[in-house]
């Protein structure tokens, strides 16, 4: 009895201390708290946008470097089987560097858990199956993306890939109940035009006469775009309906949630790609590829490591945009990066007839308009929240 009374007194004492010492956000006025929250949100969105642009640029530069070094030996004589080799390796590289994110996951501060714990075990189980299904989906996209670029003309592949944004818009409207505004629709239309005009050249595409049939090219491109669009919508659904409701991070959106999503999904995708690598006996070609690499084995390893790290930079930025804004916005930013990537590719490589032409310059200008249209919508939403808060405060005063 005495022990139970003592424990009750201790619990009451802790609760009273919690009331007397509230969180910093609770000390601030609601208006000031919302201003700080929106400022942090804008900083997070800007950081993720920069990571996507940086990751896209590094990935395409390193992919071009890799295939330029491999192209002379692997493409001298057309061999249909050679078109498939290396695709499981490239798919694995897209996901395998996730362990570098684990230290960052523990470095970022973890907010206090919410006191409510109802149905958290059920939600955690659903979250586990979401990570599992997303990992398989990302692995499928990685394989199709790597294969589609090698067996088809990159111009055709990129042209079909413009439908990716349309698929994302349709799926997010169905799965995420996304509400469109006229400015978002304008941003989508501009982004499609930008992607068509500003697509960079790719050193791994086959020479004339090497392409597969157009039906295979189209199906590979469509499958890759649908898998990517669906993964964005499911990631957004996981953030909104599952990860937030587990209350492990309180009621706030924190960057730690982004890292958790990427680590878990990339782990599953890496396992799937690793199984594919060994099941297809593609791992036996790695030693031969390193010897055929014109710059030598050291540069071969460094290029693969650089690619793996660049893919993680891109993935963290992309999932961050999905987390803080939406999957549709993440796809818009990803596709708007194409003119910047094209500029870097032109400066770094000497491809035949590949120049930063006037259409690409127009696409670069259009990128500002497309992102500006979407950012205007985000600004209006934040402004509306502030106006609603002011109105509620005025009603309380009255």
Swiss-Prot record:
GO BP annotation list: purine nucleobase transport
GO MF terms, alphabetically ordered: purine nucleobase transmembrane transporter activity; purine nucleoside transmembrane transporter activity
CC annotations in GO: membrane
Keyword flag Metal-binding: no
Region (Disordered): 1-26
TM segment ranges: 43-63, 88-108, 127-147, 155-175, 183-203, 219-239, 258-278, 301-321, 332-352, 355-375
Positions of modified residues (Phosphoserine): 29
InterPro entries: PUP_plant (IPR030182)
Biased composition (Basic and acidic residues): 11-20
Subcellular localization: Membrane
rRNA-binding found in the keyword field: no
Record keywords: Membrane, Phosphoprotein, Transmembrane, Transmembrane helix, Transport
Membrane topology designation: Multi-pass membrane protein
UniProt similarity note: Belongs to the purine permeases (TC 2.A.7.14) family.
Protein name from the UniProt record: Probable purine permease 17
Species the sequence originates in: Arabidopsis thaliana
Lineage: Eukaryota, Viridiplantae, Streptophyta, Embryophyta, Tracheophyta
Gene: PUP17
């Amino acid at each position: 009895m005495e022990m139970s009374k003592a424990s009750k007194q201790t619990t009451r004492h802790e609760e009273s201390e919690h009331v007397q010492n509230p969180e910093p956000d609770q000390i601030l006025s609601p208006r000031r708290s919302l201003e700080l929250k929106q400022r942090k949100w804008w900083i997070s969105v800007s950081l993720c946008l920069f990571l996507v642009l940086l990751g896209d640029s590094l990935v395409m530069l390193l992919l071009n470097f890799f295939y330029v070094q491999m192209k002379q030996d692997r493409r001298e004589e057309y061999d249909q089987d050679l078109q498939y080799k290396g695709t499981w390796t490239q798919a694995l590289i897209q996901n395998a560097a996730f362990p570098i994110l684990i230290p960052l996951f523990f470095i970022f501060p973890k907010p206090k858990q919410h006191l409510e714990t109802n149905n958290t075990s059920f939600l955690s189980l659903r979250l586990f199956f979401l990570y599992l299904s997303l990992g398989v989906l990302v692995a499928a996209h990685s394989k199709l993306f790597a294969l589609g670029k090698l067996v088809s003309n990159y111009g055709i592949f990129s042209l079909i890939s413009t439908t990716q944004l349309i698929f994302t818009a349709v799926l997010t409207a169905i799965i995420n109940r996304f509400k469109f505004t006229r400015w978002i629709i304008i941003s989508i239309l501009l982004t499609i035009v930008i992607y068509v005009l500003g697509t960079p050249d790719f050193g791994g595409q086959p020479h004339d006469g090497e392409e597969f049939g157009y039906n295979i090219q189209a199906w590979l491109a469509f499958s890759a775009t649908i898998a990517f669009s669906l993964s964005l919508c499911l990631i957004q659904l996981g953030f909104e309906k599952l990860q937030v409701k587990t209350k492990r991070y309180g009621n706030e959106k924190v960057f730690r949630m982004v890292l958790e999503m990427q680590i878990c999904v990339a782990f599953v995708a890496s396992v799937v790609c690793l199984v594919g690598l060994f099941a297809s006996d593609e791992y036996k070609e790695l030693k031969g590829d390193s010897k055929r690499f014109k710059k030598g084995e050291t540069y071969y390893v460094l290029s693969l490591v650089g690619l793996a790290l660049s893919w993680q930079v891109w993935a963290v930025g992309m999932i961050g945009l999905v987390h803080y804004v939406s999957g549709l916005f993440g796809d818009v930013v990803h596709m708007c990066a194409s003119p910047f990537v094209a500029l870097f590719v032109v400066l770094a490589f000497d491809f035949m007839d590949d120049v930063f032409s006037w259409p690409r310059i127009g696409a670069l200008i259009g990128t500002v308009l497309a992102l500006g249209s979407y950012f205007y919508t985000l600004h209006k939403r934040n402004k509306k929240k502030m106006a609603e808060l002011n109105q509620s405060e005025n009603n309380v005063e009255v």
